[in-house]
């Protein structure tokens, strides 16, 4: 839709502040302010698009960073479009890849898509969310339509993309079909007449292609808003199921609570900024209390309870806290436990115990496991061959020995 000039009122400034919170970039901010102003003046909501490819059946907290932003804009009264990339998933997004991504079959995509929206609905308001599948307009394109779409973008522009440039210079093959992915994602914005598209920072190139294609098709260009990629529980790499540093939103309350309690105090504040629904003023006040001497554990408990309550219930959050505290009732978790980094993930529990200095020998490690004296994130280890993937873990031997172990690949 076309957005004529309208005054930038204090209400518009407040809306803009909500959009800016935690975002990496808002392009072009002046254009988006104009769109917001026109929407308030006319009462016509903006069309806000978020596309996700159902490449895996589960959504983790990293995905919810952009979903949270979508919900904030939804609560301002705008129309949000949750786009499931069932067609583009058959190509595979090359964003951030050092090699060609294996495409999924339609059967895999359909299986994953069934759970995607159900999980996303834990963040978005289902009654006010439009669900679309990009096969609606991509399937009918056919060969002629695909060639016509490809004619609207140049190879030179496509090679401006950092991961394509890196692979080309490194002699790593780039398949022609990978050039089609950003074009099709951009064409989604044309089909939906999007006013704003959301995505992670790794999606910036694709989102900008959407702007360019809308211009090519005679539409007003969408603005783009990118959100940071959430660092996983290991505090090093972005949250990813393949890295083992993720927290799934459908995980059991106790598991979710325990993983959140295992993150570092520094990372906790980033999680507050990107995952909490508390105001920035409330978070700043809480941080000031911690800086003034209050136990950081209190802030971490509050964060864990908020997130567990959101995806389960307040009662489940209380029960998860009680279970967590019960695990350590006989031996309190020390304020400043030693932190150890162990390489070679995935790694066996016996070696981890030795590397962390919790035992003096392999035989001692094995004996402690066999006697039920070893816990990881509060759960008793019963298998001496247990392998832990990359992530951060609170490892306990007996009642008094603790270490925060960061396991890296």
Swiss-Prot record:
Subcellular location, record wording: Cytoplasm
Family under the similarity heading: Belongs to the class-I aminoacyl-tRNA synthetase family. TyrS type 2 subfamily.
Lineage: Bacteria, Pseudomonadati, Pseudomonadota, Betaproteobacteria, Burkholderiales
Gene3D superfamilies: HUPs (3.40.50.620), RNA-binding S4 domain (3.10.290.10), Tyrosyl-Transfer RNA Synthetase (1.10.240.10)
Name of the protein described by the UniProt record: Tyrosine--tRNA ligase
Annotated InterPro entries: aa-tRNA-synth_I_CS, aa-tRNA-synth_Ic, Rossmann-like_a/b/a_fold, S4_RNA-bd, S4_RNA-bd_sf, SYY-like_C, Tyr-tRNA-ligase, Tyr-tRNA-ligase_bac-type
GO CC aspect terms: cytosol
Gene Ontology terms, MF aspect: ATP binding; RNA binding; tyrosine-tRNA ligase activity
CDD domains reported in the protein's UniProt record: S4 (cd00165), TyrRS_core (cd00805)
PROSITE patterns according to UniProt: AA_TRNA_LIGASE_I, S4
Residue ranges of every copy of the S4 RNA-binding domain listed in the record: 347-407
Key words, A-Z: Aminoacyl-tRNA synthetase, ATP-binding, Cytoplasm, Ligase, Nucleotide-binding, Protein biosynthesis, RNA-binding
Highest taxon listed in the record's lineage: Bacteria
Primary role: Catalyzes the attachment of tyrosine to tRNA(Tyr) in a two-step reaction: tyrosine is first activated by ATP to form Tyr-AMP and then transferred to the acceptor end of tRNA(Tyr).
Taxonomic source organism: Bordetella bronchiseptica (strain ATCC BAA-588 / NCTC 13252 / RB50) (Alcaligenes bronchisepticus)
Residues spanned by motif 'HIGH' region: 54-63
Binding site for ATP: 241
């Amino acid at each position: 839709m076309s957005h004529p000039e309208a005054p930038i009122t204090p209400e518009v400034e407040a809306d803009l502040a909500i959009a800016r919170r935690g975002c990496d970039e808002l392009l072009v901010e002046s254009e988006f302010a104009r769109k917001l102003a026109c929407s308030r003046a006319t009462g016509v909501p903006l069309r806000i698009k978020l596309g996700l490819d159902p490449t895996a059946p589960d959504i983790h907290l990293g995905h919810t960073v952009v979903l949270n932003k979508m919900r904030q804009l939804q609560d301002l009264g705008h129309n949000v479009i949750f786009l499931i990339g069932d067609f583009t998933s058959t190509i595979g997004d090359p964003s951030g890849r050092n090699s060609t991504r294996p495409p999924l079959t339609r059967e895999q995509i359909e299986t994953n898509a069934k759970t995607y929206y159900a999980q996303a609905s834990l963040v978005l308001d289902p009654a006010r969310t439009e669900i679309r599948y990009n096969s609606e307009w991509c399937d009918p394109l056919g060969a002629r339509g695909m060639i016509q779409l490809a004619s609207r973008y140049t190879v030179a522009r496509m090679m401006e993309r950092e991961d394509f440039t890196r692979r080309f210079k490194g002699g790593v093959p780039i398949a022609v079909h990978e050039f089609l992915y950003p074009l099709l994602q951009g064409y989604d914005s044309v089909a939906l007449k999007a006013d704003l598209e959301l995505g992670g920072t790794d999606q910036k190139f694709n989102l900008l292609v959407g702007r360019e294609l809308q211009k090519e098709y005679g539409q007003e260009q969408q603005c783009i808003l990118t959100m940071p990629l959430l660092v996983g529980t290991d505090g090093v790499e972005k949250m990813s199921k393949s890295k083992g540093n993720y927290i799934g939103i459908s995980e059991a309350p106790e598991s979710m609570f325990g993983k959140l309690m295992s993150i570092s105090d520094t990372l906790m504040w980033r999680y507050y900024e990107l995952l909490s629904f508390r105001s920035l003023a409330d978070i700043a006040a809480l941080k000031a209390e911690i800086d003034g001497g209050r136990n950081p554990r209190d802030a971490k408990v509050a964060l864990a309870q908020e997130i567990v309550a959101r995806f389960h219930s307040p009662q489940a959050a209380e029960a998860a806290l009680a279970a967590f505290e019960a695990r350590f009732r006989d031996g309190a978790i020390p304020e400043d436990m030693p932190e150890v980094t162990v390489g070679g993930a995935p790694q066996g529990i016996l070696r981890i115990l030795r590397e962390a200095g919790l035992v003096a020998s392999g035989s001692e490690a094995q004996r402690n496991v066999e006697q039920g004296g070893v816990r990881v994130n509060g759960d008793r280890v019963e298998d001496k061959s247990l392998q832990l993937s990359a992530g951060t873990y609170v490892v306990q031997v007996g009642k008094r020995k603790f270490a925060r172990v960061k396991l890296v690949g």
